[in-house]
């Protein structure tokens, strides 16, 4: 984020699904560094807790009815082109993020025995590919929880697809550490079913705090092809 400040970035645009920690993290960081944040969000009758928390932390929401998050990603890119905002792709698939992640993993394990096997969930694949760069001799297991995996996203990880829909809770939720019950917990469940006792598990985040804003007061519903939130920007 400091690099973006140094580049003179005044506004970032990203996407925020109903569940996802990247938008929450960006909302907090943009607040800290006095950068405006715009988040393209899928239309719904009522925003989710994660989306509400982003708005509470200062993010400007733009709503559109979409079939899948790549459609929101396209709108975010168009918004950036029209407004000169700094576009960050879905999944934080950005060189600064990947480089920072590689350094964090490398530094953490440089004086430790490297894991033989590392489990994580996968959506866009940025996390597992980042760990694969930092830990080239580790075997990776990736549990898909949210979307169809595209070519190149998996890296060299062994692929698993969780047997329940994205918004459903995991069959097993960790009891000894905080873990989001419909996301990372699904990776934990499969580690316990198919992994070994010495396997490592990377959890993206614990449960986010509950937002304080009144969710029903946010007008988030849009019909198909209703892009009124974007018209003022020439989209």
Where are these regions (language model features)?
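Small/polar-residue-rich loop-to-helix segments that shape phosphate-bearing ligand pockets
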Residues: 43-112, 155-179
């Amino acid at each position: 984020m400091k690099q973006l400040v140094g580049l003179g970035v005044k506004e970032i645009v990203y996407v925020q699904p109903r569940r996802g920690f990247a938008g929450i993290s960006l909302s907090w960081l943009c607040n800290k560094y006095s950068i405006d944040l715009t988040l393209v969000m899928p239309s719904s009758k009522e925003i989710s807790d994660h989306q509400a928390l982003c708005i509470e932390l200062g993010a400007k929401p733009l709503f559109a009815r979409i079939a899948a998050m790549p459609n929101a990603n396209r709108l975010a890119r168009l918004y950036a082109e029209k407004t000169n905002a700094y576009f960050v792709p879905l999944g934080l698939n950005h060189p600064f993020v990947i480089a920072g992640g590689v350094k964090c993993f490398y530094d953490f394990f440089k004086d430790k025995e490297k894991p033989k096997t590392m489990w994580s969930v996968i959506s866009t694949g940025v996390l597992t590919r980042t760990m694969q760069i930092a830990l080239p001799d580790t075997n990776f297991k990736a549990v898909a929880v949210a979307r169809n995996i595209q070519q190149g996203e998996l890296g060299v990880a062994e692929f698993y697809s969780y047997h329940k829909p994205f918004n459903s809770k995991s069959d097993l939720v960790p009891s000894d550490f905080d873990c989001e019950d419909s996301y990372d917990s699904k990776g934990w469940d499969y580690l316990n079913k198919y992994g070994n006792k010495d396997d490592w598990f990377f959890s993206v985040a614990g449960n986010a705090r509950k937002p304080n804003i009144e969710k029903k007061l946010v007008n988030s519903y849009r019909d198909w092809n209703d892009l009124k939130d974007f018209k003022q920007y020439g989209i």
